[in-house]
Every structure is written in C-alpha cells, then in structure tokens.
UniProtKB/Swiss-Prot annotation:
Gene knockout outcome: Loss of DNA conjugation when disrupted in recipient strain; strain still secretes EsxB.
Residue spans of biased composition, Pro residues class: 14-23, 36-45
GO CC terms of this entry: plasma membrane
Name of the protein: Uncharacterized protein D806_0077.1
Miscellaneous comment in the UniProt entry for this protein: In the well characterized mc(2)155 strain this gene not present.
Membrane-crossing segments per the record: 53-73
Keyword terms: Cell inner membrane, Cell membrane, Membrane, Transmembrane, Transmembrane helix
Physiological role: May be involved in the ESX-1 / type VII specialized secretion system (T7SS), which exports several proteins including EsxA and EsxB. Involved in DNA conjugation in the recipient strain.
Compartments (UniProt record): Cell inner membrane
Membrane topology note: Single-pass membrane protein
Length: 377
C-alpha cells in the first residue's frame, strides 16, 4: 500500500518522494509517451533524486500513474472522516449540500472533512488497474485492442463509475464550493470516459485525463491540509474579490462537465502554461525536499528569481478565469492562483511540505487545460 499522510495541524517533512520525474515533450506533445507504473511503496528519501513535477507534463500520458500519485498523498486522519451512516441518497436539496451557501471568494483550503474519506475510494480504483492498461498506448483505437486490453479498458471503466458514485457523497459534505466542483468534475469526466469506452477513439483519453487530474488536485489540496502548509501559508495570501455569480447548484450525484465546447480563453490558457513551463526550467531542476535554511547560494537565487515569474503566471490565470465567462472555470483558475501565491509567500521560509501548494496549483491549471482539449475533440 502506498504511504499515506499521518499528521495534520503542523508542518512535517513528507516521508519520502511521492512525485515521479516529469515526462518530456511539452504540455501536448504529438508523440506517445509510455505510461509508467507507480511503485506500491515510495522509495527511501534521497537528496537530489526527486525533481519538481510540472503536473501538466506528466499528465500527457499518465492516467494510471496519476491515480497512484493521488493515493500517495491522500490524508488518512480519522478526525476528518465522513460521519457514519451518511450513504448516497437521491436528489439532494440545498440543505443537503454543505457548500450550498458558499458564494465568497475562493481561498486556500485549510480544513476539509472529506480529505480522509477519499483515500479508500481512490485506493480501490487504483487496484483495478492492470499493468497492461497502465502501459497502454491511448493513441490506439478500439479496433486495435487485443482481447486482454479490451477487457482491461472495460474493467477500468467500471472502476471509474464506482469511484464516481462514491465520490458523490463527498461532494455533498465538503463545505467548500471549489472542492465540491472538483469532486463534481471528477464524477462527470470519469463517467463520460466510461460511457465512451464502447466507442473509444484516441480523443476519448482526454476525458480520463481530466478526471484523474481533478482527483490529483484534490489529493494535493488534502496533502497541504495534512502537512500543515495550507494553514501556515493561507494567512499570507490576500483573497481576490468575491465572484459576481457562481455556478448554479445542481445535484452533485449527476454533475455536468464544465466544458462541453471550447472556451474563448482556452488557446491563451495553453500558451500561458507552456510559457510558464519554459520560464521555470531551472526551478524545476531543484530538489523540493530541501528547506530554504539549507539552500545553497545558487538554489536561493533560483528561488528568488522564480517569484516574479510565478506572480505573473498567477495574474494571467486569474484574468483568463475571469474572462472565461464560466463560473466553474473561474473557480478552478482562482483556486490555482491562490495556491500559487501561497507557494510564493512560502519561498523565503520554504519547507518540504510547501511543495504540495505548488503541485495543487499546477494540477488545477492542467485540469482546465486538458478540459479545453476534451471540449475541442
């Protein structure tokens, strides 16, 4: 079993690397990148061996790996567990949804009662994936599948449906609108992927990528809660203005995809992410498991140099989210911005737990990027 988080409330050093090395080829490489299996137990912590993961890069081809990464950073604190007896029910009313009255600005999440409950759900989902499916080539259409691969796709589709059904209860319980939206989008895209397996074509894979990126973002948000970096850095970030409108409250058990057609900001969003990847090349080479108190002069300079780059990136995402005209897109953008700025605020006194802030931010930005691709296909 993958190592889970064990502590909350104070910043602790993560027990070994959970982040795989980035794949090459940019955000949307035309080439196929083989998928890599994830070890069941994280290797021992080593200095210099683990590099930052720009989530958008790895998510080009990694679906199985991403789910496993989600398990690696899922909180296990039973104090945040879902109340017993709270099963999935029918169409809920506003009173059944804890975040129904959340119409304020999106901010760094310091507490969430669903963080512990997601672990068993995603662990079971990951266990349904065979090595054959993890290493599949998503560019192969259904007509090219072997009988074994066809069976594996169908098995994973069933696992996605099951996970989506279970996550629906978490969407009702979280008190945070943005967290509910992440759960809802996992549900919507996981089911869409499963629905399309009988008629699978290569673009169908983007639906799975959105689902697992949403799950991955949730897990990093919960990791920041569990290791205390969210609580430590959230007070350092000023909230943006409250939105003028939020997405209509629907049934979290039957959510719709937030992008079913290309959004006008999608092209620029992708360009901004590509530019950010290029501009942070040196920073991505640094070891996230070294605290600022132990940085060399070179490491300190690299981190100081990345601050204005990250601030510019955050401002660009904020403006694009606002210009999207899509309340859910805007919330995802704003949440990415808040976690990015929290990371920036952490740099002068950086500890390894702060890496979860940066990883949550890039996963959120990547989620919107892949959703744009899925909508265009």
């Amino acid at each position: 079993m993958l190592a889970g988080l064990r502590r909350r409330g104070s910043m602790t050093t993560p027990p070994g690397p959970e982040i795989p090395p980035p794949h090459q080829g940019g955000f949307y490489s035309a080439g196929h990148h083989p998928q890599r299996p994830w070890p069941e137990t994280p290797p021992p912590k080593t200095r210099g061996g683990v590099k930052w993961m720009l989530g958008a890069v790895a998510l080009l081809a990694v679906v199985g790996v991403t789910v496993a990464v989600t398990l690696a950073v899922t909180g296990k604190d039973k104090r945040d567990a879902i109340p017993p007896g709270s099963g999935v029910s029918g169409s809920p009313t506003a009173s059944d949804i804890a975040s129904a009255d959340d119409s304020g600005p999106v901010s760094v999440i310091t507490e969430d009662p669903t963080c512990a409950a997601q672990g068993p759900i995603l662990e079971t989902f990951a266990a349904q994936q065979s090595q054959l499916w993890v290493e599949r080539d998503p560019a192969l259409g259904r007509e090219s599948w072997s009988p074994e691969l066809r069976a594996d796709y169908e098995k994973v589709g069933k696992a996605m449906r099951t996970a989506a059904d279970q996550v629906a209860q978490l969407a009702k319980i979280t008190p945070h609108r943005a967290m509910r939206e992440l759960y809802e989008q996992f549900i919507a895209y996981a089911r869409a992927y499963a629905d399309n397996i009988p008629n699978y074509t290569p673009p169908t894979d983007n639906l799975a990528r959105v689902a697992v990126t949403a799950a991955d973002a949730i897990s990093y948000i919960c990791a920041a809660v569990s290791y205390g970096s969210a609580a430590a850095r959230a007070p350092l970030v000023e909230n943006r203005p409250a939105p003028t409108n939020v997405a209509p409250l629907g049934n979290p058990s039957e959510p719709e995809r937030f992008l079913t057609a290309p959004n006008p900001v999608c092209g620029e969003w992708s360009s901004v992410l590509n530019a950010f990847q290029t501009d942070t090349t040196e920073w991505l080479k640094t070891d996230p498991d070294i605290s600022s108190s132990q940085w060399s002069i070179e490491q300190k300079q690299i981190n100081e140099n990345v601050i204005p780059i990250m601030k510019r990136f955050a401002n660009q995402l904020y403006l694009l989210g606002k210009d999207s005209g899509n309340p859910t897109f805007r919330d995802i953008a704003d949440l990415s911005v808040q976690y990015r700025l929290a990371y920036v605020a952490a740099i002068p006194t950086y500890t390894p737990a702060d890496k979860y802030l940066a990883n949550a931010s890039i996963r959120l930005a990547t989620m919107a990027n892949v959703a744009c691709r899925a909508a265009a296909d």
